[in-house]
């Protein structure tokens, strides 16, 4: 049975290979909110070590779980992990530096919350957006990235990328569940301030009710105004989104009507 189908549970096989190779702490990292029209992009990090036991029953990539299953798993995942955290980059930061640099910022904020930095990060996908860019960017000025006084990891831990790591690696799947449930809670809370957009249900993605509200009411401060928001004219004075490796992967047509919305 192919693990890509989600029917084979993720395991610690890859994490344990790295632990046996001499890494004391290995972290799984995954993001959520990349393709959303509103709200933050969020990055979860979950750390395991050689003593970490088998993952909680039912753990899967967050996109393969119902909201109720994710919520039930989240506290179990936190107790199972050696350490865990979720970091965010807000819409204004995404507009200022672009989605890839915003992912890096959110990931570094998550790593900065850990009591001890991991020796190695397993990052879902094939693009390393967590490590320092080859050239300085607006991100450096925005959040003091690279300055130890800013409380952010400097330098970033070693990173290895794995396609479908959120499906096959338990630490990454756990990170995806924590990132998703944390961001969902944030968007539900922000729904109270901006109820027109239906964020309690669509979580900021381009569901029909959100698109209808955008057409009727326009964008609010929680929207990513540098993006091409359906039915909304580009905001004056907002910089064009900065492009970078992986930016083309942004999907603003994500369907959150099923458990697969992330």
Swiss-Prot record:
Biased composition (Low complexity): 236-246
A biological process term (GO) from this entry: mismatch repair
Assigned EC number: 3.1.26.4
Cell compartment(s), UniProt: Cytoplasm
UniProt domain RNase H type-2: residue ranges: 24-243
Catalytic activity: Endonucleolytic cleavage to 5'-phosphomonoester
Annotated a divalent metal cation binding sites: 30-31, 124
HAMAP family: RNase_HII_B
Family to which the UniProt record says this protein belongs: Belongs to the RNase HII family.
Protein's job: Endonuclease that specifically degrades the RNA of RNA-DNA hybrids.
Listed name of the protein: Ribonuclease HII
């Amino acid at each position: 049975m192919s693990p890509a189908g989600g029917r084979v549970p993720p395991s610690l096989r890859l994490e344990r290979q790295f632990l046996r190779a001499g890494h004391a702490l290995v972290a799984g990292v995954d993001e959520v909110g990349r393709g959303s029209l509103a709200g933050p992009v969020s990055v979860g990090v979950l750390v395991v070590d050689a003593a970490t036991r088998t993952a909680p029953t039912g753990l899967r990539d967050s996109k393969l779980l119902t909201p109720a299953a994710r919520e039930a798993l989240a506290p179990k995942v936190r107790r199972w992990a050696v350490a865990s955290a979720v970091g965010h980059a807000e819409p204004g930061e995404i507009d200022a530096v672009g989605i890839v640099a915003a992912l890096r910022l959110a990931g570094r904020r998550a790593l900065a919350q850990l009591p001890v930095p991991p020796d190695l990060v397993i990052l879902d996908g094939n693009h390393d957006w967590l490590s320092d860019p080859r050239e300085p960017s607006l991100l450096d000025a925005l959040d003091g990235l690279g300055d130890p006084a800013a409380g952010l990891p400097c330098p970033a831990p070693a990173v290895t990328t794995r396609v479908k790591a959120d499906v096959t690696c338990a630490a990454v799947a756990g990170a995806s569940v924590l990132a998703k449930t944390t961001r969902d809670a944030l968007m539900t809370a922000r729904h109270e301030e901006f109820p027109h957009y239906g964020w309690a249900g669509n979580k900021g993605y381009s569901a029909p009710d959100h698109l209808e509200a955008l057409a009727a009411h326009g964008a609010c401060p929680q929207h990513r105004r540098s993006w091409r928001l359906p039915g909304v004219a580009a905001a004056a004075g907002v910089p064009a989104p900065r492009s970078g490796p992986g930016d083309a992967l942004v999907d603003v047509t994500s369907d959150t009507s099923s458990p697969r919305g992330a």
